[in-house]
């Protein structure tokens, strides 16, 4: 993976990491309030982010983010999540999500006690670009994001796409791939299961500023991140 390495002040890095985690959770909590689309899957996500903390920005979700369906079809909808019009001078970040209806209906499983599996570090080691997520990490994320999507429940659960995306964005920011104001497109290409190891790599195409997340065992592409 070819990246631009930059040395950051540790205090600044911690502040930006904290801000990004909170900001992404704000978007994802807002999306979870959208009713009538339980079991639908994320196709693509477009993010407009400012990686630098803003003066006076201390509160978690200090502005109200509202999901708005901007395009609707039988098997797909496009949702924009942004601040109210009167708050856009202060808060201009937003997220657009394409939700796709699965070919087969998803049954909501009965509530069951999830086994606490061994913890696998979320961001891998500092020496490689390996990531993996345990079932307990998934459960913690679902609580934080208020995510009740049935495809993330039960023994056959797939990992929340945003959990995987968030970890990738944090890793890429630490490596200097993104800074300042950034517009990104994230494509979700295949589902990922708990404990499945994946790694980050570049597109391998000259002039294409894209990063892919692939499974270690088969090299299957899970998602792509492109700077717009």
Predicted regions and their residues:
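Catalytic strand-loop segment that frames the active site of acyl-thioester-processing enzymes
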Residues: 1-23, 98-159, 173
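A short linear-motif detector with a strong N-terminal bias
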Residues: 24-29, 40-44, 57-60, 74, ...
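Intrinsically disordered, low-complexity boundary segments flanking structured domains
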Residues: 28-36, 117-119, 169-174
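Hydrophobic, proline/glycine-rich low-complexity stretches
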Residues: 1-60, 152
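Arginine residue identity/basic-tract feature
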Residues: 2-4, 19, 23, 29, ...
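Acidic/His-leaning functional-site neighborhoods
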Residues: 135-212
């Amino acid at each position: 993976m070819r990246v631009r390495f930059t040395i950051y002040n540790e205090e600044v890095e911690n502040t930006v990491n904290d801000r990004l985690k909170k900001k992404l959770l704000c978007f994802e909590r807002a999306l979870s309030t959208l009713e009538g689309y339980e079991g639908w899957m994320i196709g693509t996500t477009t993010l407009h982010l400012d990686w630098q903390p803003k003066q006076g920005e201390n509160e978690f979700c200090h502005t109200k983010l509202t999901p708005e369906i901007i395009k609707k079809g039988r098997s797909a909808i496009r949702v924009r999540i942004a601040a109210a019009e009167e708050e856009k001078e202060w808060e201009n970040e937003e997220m657009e999500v394409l939700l796709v209806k699965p070919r087969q209906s998803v049954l909501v499983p009965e509530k069951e006690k999830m086994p606490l599996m061994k913890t696998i570090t979320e961001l891998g080691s500092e020496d490689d670009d390996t990531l993996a997520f345990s079932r307990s990490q998934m459960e913690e994320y679902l609580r934080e994001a208020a995510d009740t999507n049935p495809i993330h429940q039960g023994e056959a659960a797939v990992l929340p796409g945003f959990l995987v995306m968030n970890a990738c964005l944090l890793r890429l920011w630490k490596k200097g791939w993104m800074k300042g104001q950034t517009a990104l497109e994230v494509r979700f290409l295949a589902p990922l299961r708990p404990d499945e190891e994946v790694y980050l790599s570049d597109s391998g195409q000259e002039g294409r500023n894209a990063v892919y997340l692939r499974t270690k065992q088969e090299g299957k592409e899970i998602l792509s991140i492109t700077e717009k």
